[in-house]
Regions:
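Alpha-helical secondary-structure segments
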Residues: 10-12, 59, 89-90, 137-187, ...
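Structural transition elements
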Residues: 180-220, 242-244
Length: 387
């Protein structure tokens, strides 16, 4: 990729090949331009590691941040071009690791917008301050499809998916506004401009529980793989309470409805989880994808062969070829057609087992307005104000 400034306000970018989602791609922060003189002055290794090594051209600038403190400020930038539209003098951010603590701080008037999850979110669903933000965020099971693993067999993967009651999972286990998943790409991520339909809706398949069909597929899969005795599956995940609750639910569903299978759960800190996954020491892994930008390719690309995020080692030439075609075409019609076909192929091959679409729960003071919540990307407080 070549980049050249051809004038004060014109940037020319030359690509090796067409990228249909280019305009969305460059909204990702890693592509935002930097002040070269300032970066050179502070050094590339130090740039962006504290308030003094960060430069801003937005409505606010970073202040009181050392790089490790839990509380810092965004102060109004008096050089911002649209000063008249900015109402807040500063924004105070506080990192709160515990949802119950966040709730208490909100109740004490020390937070105006608090993100909560887990048991806390579940218990506050009827609070008038609750706001659900549907994110471009899908929670799913990665399935170990390495050679010699029992779940390399597609029928066994399909059977697992068919016994999981996603309605029960979201309504009783999570009860935080999350919704059953029927596709890898979450609703609201993108509208297919060639069909005018939500991409998630047009590529969804039924994930309704079907125990009888699951048992037939499981029996056929066991016969094909020639597995003797009990299939031992280890379900790994991080050590958060919500992850443990989901793991126990999946474990119960699988063992209740399928024969000759034992699911062991293993919940470890995130670093340990990544090691287990990279070493292939799992049968199933609880994971999620939160889109960087609002386009289906951002999801589907992580499951191409060789992608570092593809811990289950799903590999399918048809799927790979469809995504490559989508990534290299300049035709919007071809782009969206290839993505639809790829999403359908992923579902058909059961490359992963989608569980639910995450709904982020916020506690927001009634006086706060003008905040923009996005499915993909960060919450925007630029033009926020208090009524």
């Amino acid at each position: 990729m070549g980049i050249k400034a051809t004038g004060k306000r014109t940037l020319k970018i030359t690509l090796d090949h067409p990228i249909a989602a280019f305009n969305k791609l460059v909204t990702v922060p890693v592509f935002l331009p930097q002040d070269q003189k300032f970066v050179t002055k502070v050094g590339t290794s130090r740039y962006g590691t504290s308030a003094s090594t960060t430069v801003s051209n937005g409505a606010f600038k970073v202040a009181s941040w050392t790089g490790s403190n839990d509380t810092y400020l965004l102060k109004r930038n008096r050089y911002y071009w649209d000063q008249k539209a900015i109402h807040l003098k500063q924004i105070r951010y506080q990192t709160v690791k515990d949802a119950n603590t966040a709730h208490n701080l909100f109740e004490d008037g020390k937070l105006d917008d608090a993100t909560i999850s887990g048991v806390t979110a579940k218990s506050l669903q009827h609070d008038t301050a609750v706001k659900h933000v549907d994110r471009a965020w899908t929670y799913y099971l990665q399935v170990n499809q390495r050679a010699g693993q029992p779940l390399e067999n597609r029928k066994l993967r399909q059977a697992l998916s068919l016994v999981i009651n996603r309605q029960q999972l979201t309504k009783t286990v999570l009860a935080d506004g999350s919704k059953p998943a029927s596709s890898f790409v979450s609703p609201g991520t993108a509208v297919d401009p060639t069909t005018k339909r939500d991409f998630s809706a047009e590529t969804s398949t039924s994930t309704k529980v079907n125990i009888a069909k699951a048992k037939r597929l499981w029996a056929a899969g066991l016969k094909e793989t020639k597995v003797k005795g009990t299939v031992q599956l280890t379900l790994v995940g991080d050590d958060q309470d919500v992850t443990k609750n989901v793991a126990q639910f999946v474990q119960q569903q699988v063992q209740q409805h399928l024969s000759r299978v034992k699911v062991s759960t293993k919940n470890v800190p995130d670093k340990g989880l990544q090691n287990l996954k990279s070493d292939g020491q799992f049968g199933l892994s609880q994971w999620y994808w939160l889109a960087d930008f609002a386009d289906p390719v951002n999801y589907l690309g992580v499951l191409q062969s060789g992608n570092s995020m593809n811990s289950g080692r799903f590999s399918d030439k048809t799927y790979d070829d469809l995504l490559t075609k989508a990534k290299q075409t300049s035709s919007q019609k071809q782009y969206w057609q290839s993505l639809r076909q790829a999403a359908n192929r992923l579902q058909n091959q059961m490359g992963i087992v989608p569980l639910y679409y995450v709904s982020e729960t916020h506690l927001v003071t009634h006086k706060l307005a003008g905040v923009e919540y996005h499915a993909a990307g960060e919450t925007d407080y630029t033009r926020a104000y208090f009524k």
